[in-house]
């Protein structure tokens, strides 16, 4: 029997956590039965299980993960919960699609806010908005397109010049920025662990339980794990690009690795070298070449930059070390006054990308469902995708299902080695086009 690949990062999540945050559950040992099995405890899997359990509290639902929620890819992102689409287009149809997308993202934020508030999840939730910044004036056309999109969507924003950005961010690296309210910043490891911890009672969670195979049999499904099997009526795949190794359909998404580093907390002396600053988050005008930055409530800087193909979900220690060197050079370029601030940890995580930006969402086959193809910025997006998939699977009437379906479906991706060559070429092209937005 051929088994699926298991995601593996040769590094540890860098977000500050205590033992209680980890929410460790036992691994599966033995053979069990359930009405539903959910594979993956990220934002889509957790929201799907939560909604399924609330629709029918009599269902028995099993959720498994190859790791635990607090160390999974969903815990490894930069902690931005974004409620606005970036790209709209010029036609009436494209504007309508963007408005639908905004409605989905904002409903995802509302659901997260409700759950965090209800269960008092300590995830450092801060509604502070975000900055979208350019380094080089040659990126002006891209920034102007973003302004035009915000105006079309009738969204509030503020334009800032380099000096104004310095007062907000403490760096003179950027020549221009756009501030938009409404973006939430969190510690994503604490958030996803808290969401998994507070699932309804009819959801049973198993950690360190990778799904090695998924088969349809006898009017149901069978999931093979390291030390057991799960037989269920139906299955939901919340495994993003690795779903192709479990699902009976063609590949439509690829896995990319991104890297982040976090500094030690700044000392009072080091903070004196900066303007008085509150927590903030910054996204670059070019997401592949540029750097995402954050300044946290406990006086740390986070740097997210560099993207590698990770088509089999594996990131090596060597790749992580290379990213750490880049991050330190980048941080010192942005903040020359903080040469004595060390990076405390560097880690990686994977995102799923599709060729046309559309999700992989819906029913893959009889009794098998999925919500994948997050294309980055997936906290709010995958939360609502999981909720709506549960509504669709259970025959619930929800007008946002149509909005989700309007996003389309991801295009076909070729198998390796053609996929490997295509992904490497696309990354090289994006880095070249955005080379002036690379700080180092």
Predicted region positions:
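Glycine-rich FAD pyrophosphate-binding loop
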Residues: 53-76
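Helix-loop-beta segment of a Rossmann-like dinucleotide-binding subdomain
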Residues: 122-132, 164-194, 306
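Helical element adjacent to the flavin cofactor pocket in flavoenzyme catalytic cores
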Residues: 148, 173-233
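C-terminal catalytic lobe of FAD-dependent flavoproteins
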Residues: 309-429
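Short beta-strand to alpha-helix junction loop
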Residues: 101-106, 133-142, 178-197, 206-208, ...
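Dinucleotide-binding Rossmann-like beta1-alpha1 core, especially the glycine-rich loop
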Residues: 83-162
């Amino acid at each position: 029997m051929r088994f699926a690949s298991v995601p593996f990062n040769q590094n540890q999540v860098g977000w500050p956590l205590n033992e209680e945050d980890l929410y460790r559950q036992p691994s599966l040992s033995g053979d069990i039965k359930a009405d539903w099995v959910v594979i993956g405890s990220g934002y889509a899997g957790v929201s799907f299980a939560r909604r399924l359990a609330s629709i029918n509290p009599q269902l028995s639902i099993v959720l498994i993960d190859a790791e635990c929620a607090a160390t999974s890819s969903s815990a490894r992102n930069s902690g931005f919960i974004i409620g606005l689409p970036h790209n709209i287009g010029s036609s009436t149809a494209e504007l309508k699609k963007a408005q639908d997308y905004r409605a989905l993202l904002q409903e995802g934020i509302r659901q997260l806010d409700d759950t965090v508030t209800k269960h008092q999840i300590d995830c450092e939730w801060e509604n502070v908005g975000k900055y979208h910044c350019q380094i080089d004036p040659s990126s002006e056309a891209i920034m102007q397109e973003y302004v035009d999109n915000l105006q079309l969507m009738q969204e509030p924003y503020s334009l800032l010049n380099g000096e104004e950005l310095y007062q907000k961010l403490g760096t003179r690296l950027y020549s221009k920025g756009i501030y938009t309210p409404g973006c939430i910043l969190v510690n994503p490891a604490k958030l996803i662990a808290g969401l998994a911890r507070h699932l309804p009672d009819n959801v049973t969670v198993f950690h360190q339980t990778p799904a090695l195979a998924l088969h349809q049999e006898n009017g149901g499904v069978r999931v093979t794990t390291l030390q057991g099997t799960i037989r269920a009526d139906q299955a939901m795949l919340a495994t993003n690009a690795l779903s192709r190794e479990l699902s009976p359909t063609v590949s439509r998404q690829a896995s990319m690795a991104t890297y982040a580093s976090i500094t030690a907390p700044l000392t009072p002396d080091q903070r004196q070298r900066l303007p008085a600053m509150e927590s903030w988050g910054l996204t670059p005008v070019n997401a592949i070449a540029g750097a995402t930055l954050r300044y946290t409530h406990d006086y740390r800087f986070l740097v997210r930059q560099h993207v590698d193909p990770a088509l089999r979900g594996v990131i090596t220690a060597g790749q992580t070390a290379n990213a750490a060197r880049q991050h330190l050079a980048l941080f010192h370029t942005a903040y020359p006054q903080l040469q004595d601030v060390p990076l405390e940890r560097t880690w990686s995580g994977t995102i799923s990308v599709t060729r046309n930006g559309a999700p992989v969402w819906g029913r893959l086959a009889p009794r098998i469902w999925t919500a994948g193809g997050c294309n980055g910025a997936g906290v709010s997006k995958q939360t609502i995708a999981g909720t709506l998939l549960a509504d669709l699977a259970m025959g619930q009437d929800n007008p946002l299902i149509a909005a989700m379906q309007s996003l389309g479906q991801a295009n076909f991706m070729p198998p390796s080695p053609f996929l490997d060559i295509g992904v490497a070429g696309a990354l090289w092209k994006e880095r070249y086009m955005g080379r002036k937005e690379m700080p180092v």
